[in-house]
């Protein structure tokens, strides 16, 4: 039987406010345990929550960016459950009237096509504290620094049909919230976490299968692996005559499998009711206009502009628009070099490889946009070849200066004098007289392969400095003359 996968995601984004959603406590990461928890965060009697307006502004900004309905009358509710790191015994969230309603996001896929994923809603809520198991022998410690940190939970429609589509969607959300400046997107620190709802159904069936939720997956790689693992489990279970039970599961990356955590709850299990300590939030049209005026150029628009303005492919434009910093870096390089495609290639390949190797972000790049753009100018004016440029790039990354300084200091200037190149070729051909005879006796098909040998020898003889185009032209003339 052929199966169709159905995936919906819930993405929890920690908002980059300076203080918590209902108290004045700091949200800074990495503080000593329980040093950033106020009486409000601890759920002490006699204290009342006060809504952080900046969290509201950030939620509205996201809603406008995904063309969503904005809940201009939205209500906070109490989500009741017991867990050691939830001091009040309930979480303040939103249920029936969220701040962001239906919207959508267009995401780029690997094959260069676009897919629209519906967004069901996005609601504000407070984060819980953190249970610490490893630091205590046979016991659990509770750190409430995180309790009350503002979260925007973004709930998608079940529109994704593969793990790769799910990852593409998470990457698009990740890029968007970073562009907006509402979340730093640091998955390692838990700033962006993902719950994956996965089910399968026979191909062609309209009705959904029974879904399982994989909780708190915190990397793109693990999202793909966790979903694929759960897909395999469900298919094997059904094909062996079993039945999928609705439950919450955890992904174990060491065993590459999901394991049950608890039975999956429904909304009524949490006994939601409006929080009597918080008034409904009323958002005026004037506030929406203010927020709309602050929206930057977003990834979809930037991607589209890169394609139209620079003639880039969907893939290249999508990669370069991944973050504002990378897009700005690329545009600066392209502006200096006057060649967007050359700039795109160097930013994505050479610079990307360097950053991955050194574990750096684009804003920490050891080669500035001005340096890279200046080097590309030297490729374009034939001062250096593409091969020599890699040596220059490496030297710039090691702090040896800009391209012109390195070229002069190391004597890397390309030889473009046809007389000098001709002399090098004559010497090289004389040293390879036997191969020259074989080339001249060979048919056209074999000559193509043999020609590469002579080009390699010529570049070696010139220490890589001869202009490759001139080498090709002169060499062809000499071999066939």
From Swiss-Prot:
InterPro entries: Asn/Gln-tRNA_amidoTrfase_suB/E (IPR017959), Asn/Gln-tRNA_Trfase_suB/E_cat (IPR006075), Asn/Gln_amidotransferase (IPR018027), Asn/Gln_tRNA_amidoTrase-B-like (IPR003789), GatB (IPR004413), GatB_C_1 (IPR042114), GatB_Yqey_C_2 (IPR023168), Gln-tRNA_amidoTrfase_suB_CS (IPR017958). The keyword Oxidoreductase does not apply. One of its GO terms (molecular function) is asparaginyl-tRNA synthase (glutamine-hydrolyzing) activity. SUPFAM superfamilies: GatB/YqeY motif, Glutamine synthetase/guanido kinase. It holds the Pfam family GatB_N. The keyword DNA repair does not apply. Its EC number is 6.3.5.-. GO terms for biological process: glutaminyl-tRNAGln biosynthesis via transamidation; translation. It is an enzyme of class 6 (ligase). It catalyses: L-glutamyl-tRNA(Gln) + L-glutamine + ATP + H2O = L-glutaminyl-tRNA(Gln) + L-glutamate + ADP + phosphate + H(+); L-aspartyl-tRNA(Asn) + L-glutamine + ATP + H2O = L-asparaginyl-tRNA(Asn) + L-glutamate + ADP + phosphate + 2 H(+). Keywords: ATP-binding, Ligase, Nucleotide-binding, Protein biosynthesis. HAMAP family: GatB (MF_00121). Belongs to the GatB/GatE family. GatB subfamily. Allows the formation of correctly charged Asn-tRNA(Asn) or Gln-tRNA(Gln) through the transamidation of misacylated Asp-tRNA(Asn) or Glu-tRNA(Gln) in organisms which lack either or both of asparaginyl-tRNA or glutaminyl-tRNA synthetases. The reaction takes place in the presence of glutamine and ATP through an activated phospho-Asp-tRNA(Asn) or phospho-Glu-tRNA(Gln). NCBIfam families: gatB (TIGR00133), PRK05477.1-2 (NF004012), PRK05477.1-4 (NF004014), PRK05477.1-5 (NF004015). Heterotrimer of A, B and C subunits. This is Aspartyl/glutamyl-tRNA(Asn/Gln) amidotransferase subunit B. It comes from Pseudomonas fluorescens (strain ATCC BAA-477 / NRRL B-23932 / Pf-5). The lineage of its organism: Bacteria, Pseudomonadati, Pseudomonadota, Gammaproteobacteria, Pseudomonadales.
């Amino acid at each position: 039987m052929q199966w169709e996968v159905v995936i919906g995601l819930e993405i929890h984004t920690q908002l980059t406010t300076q203080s918590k959603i209902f108290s004045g406590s700091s949200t800074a990461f990495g503080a000593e345990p329980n040093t950033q928890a106020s009486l409000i965060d601890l759920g002490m009697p006699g204290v009342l929550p006060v809504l952080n307006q900046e969290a509201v502004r950030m939620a509205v900004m996201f809603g406008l960016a995904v063309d969503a309905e904005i809940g201009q009358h939205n209500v906070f509710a109490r989500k009741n459950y017991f867990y050691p790191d939830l001091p009040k015994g309930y979480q303040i969230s939103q249920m029936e009237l969220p701040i962001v309603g239906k919207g959508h996001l267009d995401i780029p896929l690997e094959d260069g096509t676009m897919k629209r994923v519906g967004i069901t809603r996005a609601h504000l809520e407070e984060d819980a504290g953190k249970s610490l198991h490893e630091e205590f022998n046979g016991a659990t410690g509770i750190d409430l620094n995180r309790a009350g940190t503002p979260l925007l939970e973004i709930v998608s429609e079940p529109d994704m049909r593969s793990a790769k589509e799910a990852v593409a969607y998470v990457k698009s959300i990740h890029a968007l919230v970073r562009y907006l400046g509402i979340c730093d997107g640091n998955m390692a620190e838990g700033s962006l976490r993902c719950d994956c709802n996965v089910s399968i159904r026979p191909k062609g069936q309209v009705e959904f299968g029974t879904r399982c939720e994989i909780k708190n997956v915190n990397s793109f790689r693990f999202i793909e692996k966790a979903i694929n693992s759960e897909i395999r489990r469900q298919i094997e279970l059904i094909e062996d005559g079993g039945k999928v039970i609705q439950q919450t599961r955890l992904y174990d990356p060491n065993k590459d499998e999901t394991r049950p955590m608890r039975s999956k709850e429904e909304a009524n299990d949490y006994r939601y009711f409006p929080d009597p300590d918080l008034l409904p939030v009323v958002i005026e049209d004037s506030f929406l206009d203010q927020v709309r005026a602050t929206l930057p150029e977003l990834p979809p628009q930037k991607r589209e502009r890169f394609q139209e303005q620079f003639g880039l492919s969907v893939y290249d434009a999508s990669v370069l628009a991944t973050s504002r910093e990378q897009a700005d870096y690329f545009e600066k390089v392209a502006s200096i070099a006057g060649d967007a495609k050359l700039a795109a290639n160097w930013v994505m390949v050479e610079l990307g490889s360097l950053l991955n190797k050194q574990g750096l972000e684009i804003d920490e790049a050891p080669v500035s946009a001005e340096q890279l753009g200046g080097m590309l100018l030297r490729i374009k004016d034939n001062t250096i070849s593409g091969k020599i440029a890699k040596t220059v790039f490496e030297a710039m990354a090691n702090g040896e200066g800009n391209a012109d300084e390195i070229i002069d200091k190391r004597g890397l200037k390309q030889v473009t004098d046809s007389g000098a190149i001709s002399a090098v070729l004559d010497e090289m051909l004389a040293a390879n007289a036997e191969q020259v005879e074989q080339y001249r006796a060979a048919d056209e098909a074999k000559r193509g392969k043999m020609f590469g040998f002579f080009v390699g020898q010529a570049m070696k003889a010139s220490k890589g400095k001869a202009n490759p185009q001139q080498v090709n032209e002169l060499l062809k003339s000499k071999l066939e003359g």
